[in-house]
Amino acid sequence: MIAAVFLLAALQPAVSPIENEIVVIGRRLNSISAMVGKDQKGRFTCSLDKSSGNINLDKRLCKTTVRCIRDGAIGDSAIKTCVDAEKPKLLAKLRRELKGSRE
């Protein structure tokens, strides 16, 4: 029985440290709220209630949220739906950047 457990463990594909990091950041990303407003000149401003741990991803999350609003998402539910649809793309870009920086 113990040998079977070790055999199964050996057959499992190894998860890279980058993939582990993406999973952790993805979980954090799902718990972040963005607050968007406009300054006195009518420019959009964005702030996050916490960080994903990656400043570039945080910036992209704000840009994505603003883009959703500019594209017509009105109300929290519509904005959330729009942003959630873009999160896989944000994480894919982060994954490429992390792989590139560690090669």
Predicted regions and their residues:
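Classic N-terminal secretory signal peptides
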Residues: M1-V15
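Post-signal/leader-peptide non-cytosolic segments of secretory proteins
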Residues: A14-E103
